[in-house]
Every structure is written in structure tokens, then in C-alpha cells.
Amino acid sequence: VGLLAILAMVVVPLPPFVLDVLFTFNIALSIVVVMAVFYVARPLEFGVFPTVLLLATLLRLALNVASTRVVLMHGHQGTGAAGHVIESFGEFVIGGNYVVGVVVFVILTIVNFGVVTKGAGRISEVSARCTLDAMPGKPMAGGADLHAGRVTQDEARKRRAEVRAEAEFFGSMDGASKFVRGDATAGILILLINMIGGLAIGTLMHDMSLADAARNYALLTIGDGLVAQLPALLLSTAVALIVTRMSGEQDMGGEVARQLFGRPKALWIAAGL
């Protein structure tokens, strides 16, 4: 049902208030995913993360298409034509200076695409490869423990299932990270389409001056881009966190506090410096 709704968003024009609700839901979903990643002790505890990541990426792309349609069709009516969320993001970031808004959006895109997404994709690829390479040895070690009587048959079966689930998880993460990187690329192209197309439509079809068209469409375009890039950056961060997460007994906060602040000598030296 959710997938069909996402596909319908691409085809059916959405009113601005529906876009506001969906953009708010998208941001909230990204925050929930990041928080869930923080509180898992092992990556397999969030085994549905690749599926959630894929659905969230598809939702964001569908919202990009829907908002682009609204911006290009109704942008000449004013900065509130695409909803309050896009207008608020645009006004907050631009602050009366459109160059600043464009620069902020470009910086966020570079951070997301060139740093977080690229690094997370590389880590996912290496993790999947290392997990697959280690698969033959782990069942053999479990079989040796079973024959030696160190584990029961149920425990050996559970270990084999965990090895298989771990390989499937990191393999899925390797593929899902490609969707995230493609989404970041699509965000750049959508920004250019909205800006160039908006200026052309405003000046040629609605007899707006170049300054008025730039004011309306620049604000809507930058607001639309930021509303999409913020959840994308959060999900990219979640991908990077979960693929770099080592299995432990505590969540990420507990492990960081124990390992980073568990050595008083290092803290005293840092305080002295």
C-alpha cells in the first residue's frame, strides 16, 4: 500500500497542504531512523534498515517530483504556492540573500554527496565483501565447536543463521547505499531544473519581470532543495553509522562513553594540554 501511494504521488498533483504533511513526515521519519541506529547494540538488531532506507529514498524522490510540479505550475502566484514548509525553509536559509541560500544548499549537497554518502557506500561495499569472504570459515568454526561439545546443536544452528543474516544485511546495505547516492545526484539536477525552468516559465508564460521570477522561484527552489537534502543527509549519516557499528553489548552512546572516557590518563593529558 505504501509503495502504491508513493507511485501515486509521482502521477497525481498534490495540493500544498498535503505536501506540508508529507515533508514533515519525511523529516520525522529520518530523525526516527537516526535515533534507532543510535540505540542498536548490533547492526542485525535493525535488520530491516536497508528496506526502510529504500522506501524512504523512494518517498523523497516522489516528493521531489510532486514539489517540482507545484513549484513550476504555481510558483508565479507567490512564495507560498508550494506550501508553508518549503516557504519557511527558503525564507529561513535565504534571509533576504539568494546567493547565501544557494551557497548553503551547495555546501549541504557536497557534504552529503561527496563526504557522507561516498564514504558510507565504500564502507558498505568493503563490509559486504569481507562478510562474504568470512562466510566459509564461520560455519566450519561452529561445526568444530559442535563436535567438541562446546555448543549445543541449537546454538550451532543459531550461529549459522546469524552468519547468513549478517551476509544478507551487508549485501543489502551495499545496494541500498547506491540508492542514497543516486538520490543526492537527483537533488542537484532537480535544483537546476526548478531554477532554470521556473525563470523561463515566469518570464515567458506569466509575463513576470526577471527580478520577480528570480525572487519567487529562487526561494521555492532553494526551500524545496533544503527540505529534501536535510532528510537525505540524516539518512546518509544513519547509513554511515550502522555500517561502521561494531557488535557490542551496549548501544552506541554507551560504547563511546566506555571506550573514549574509560581511560582517565588520556583525559588528564588532554586537560593539561
Question: What is each model feature region?
Answer:
Residues 3, 8-27, 38, 47-57, 91-118, 178-179, 273, ...:
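Hydrophobic alpha-helical transmembrane segments
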Residues 2, 6, 258-273:
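Hydrophobic membrane-spanning alpha-helices of multi-pass integral membrane proteins
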Residues 4-6, 25-39:
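Central hydrophobic cores of alpha-helical transmembrane segments in multi-pass inner-membrane proteins
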Residues 166-196, 227, 263-272:
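Transmembrane alpha-helical segments and their cytosolic interface motifs
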Residues 99-105, 152-154, 270:
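Select transmembrane alpha-helical segments in multipass membrane proteins
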Residues 19, 34-55, 65-90, 114-177, ...:
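Juxtamembrane helix-loop transition segments at the membrane interface in multi-pass membrane proteins
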Residues 22, 60, 123, 176, ...:
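Residue-level signature of catalytic and energy-coupling elements of molecular machines
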